[in-house]
Amino acid sequence: MAGQFDSEDRGSWYWGRLSRGDAVSLLQGQRHGTFLVRDSGSIPGDFVLSVSESSRVSHYIVNSLGPAGGRRAGGEGPGAPGLNPTRFRIGDQEFDSLPSLLEFYKIHYLDTTTLIEPVSRSRQNSGVILRQEEVEYVRALFDFNGNDDEDLPFKKGDILKIRDKPEEQWWNAEDMDGKRGMIPVPYVEKCRPSSASVSTLTGGNQDSSHPQPLGGPEPGPYAQPSINTPLPNLQNGPFYARVIQKRVPNAYDKTALALEVGELVKVTKINMSGQWEGECNGKRGHFPFTHVRLLDQQNPDEDFS
């Protein structure tokens, strides 16, 4: 299902001069397809489309072009009137306006997601325009007993402090007793704990042991959009995708679909939550859409690269 946001409402998605680190702080942990547009910190007049996708935040450079396709000088903002008409380029695609660019990526994949909704302004108004050094917390969705000595066991409902993200699916965390170890990302959700929990986890105050900023300085590296990958229309029937990331669902969730890299999945339903439904190896269930990549629907059995 395509995003339902109003691309003409610039106030909902344009954040102006926002640092890369602040963009990451706003988008990290948000559902896939949540995005914002900000001014480029390195090239005046250009913009950056920052998007939450695949357990990371990607940044796509959007170049401002003059009427003849040349670079435009100055930074007027996406809605400011200019003396010359301006076009915008992302990857190999060009658009007459930023709203038309956003409309395109409502139904076309950037890399692993389409654009679903702008990040909420309430995160800024409520003081969550997180400082780059602010600690991130997660809440456990399931019990985890740990498989190795380096793992951090926890119980459902536990609040953990994230210290590092060395892998996409495994983060380094600390519990309320000060124990540290690796935790599986699918077992937790981002949260804002009570002040009491924060006090316990931080030893009563914020010290200098904060994680490093999450996005790195501008410029780049910038992601490149994967063009010509439209979101299929299920009115034309189911479509096929190839598994790109293994998934071992929780044993208690009988509706979750287990996935192995390379398997073919028949997608039967797209949900805005990012949980798709489909069939694989004769079994039906739901799975995160970030674990698969769409195939050429005319030749779904061809080797996937």
Curated annotation (Swiss-Prot):
Residues 194-231 are annotated as: Disordered. Residues 133-193, 236-297 form the SH3 domain. It is found in: Cytoplasm; Cell membrane. PROSITE patterns: SH2, SH3. Transmembrane segments: none annotated. It holds the Pfam family SH2. One of its GO terms (biological process) is negative regulation of wound healing. Residues 194-211 have a biased composition (Polar residues). Belongs to the CRK family. This is Adapter molecule crk. It comes from Gallus gallus. The lineage of its organism: Eukaryota, Metazoa, Chordata, Craniata, Vertebrata.
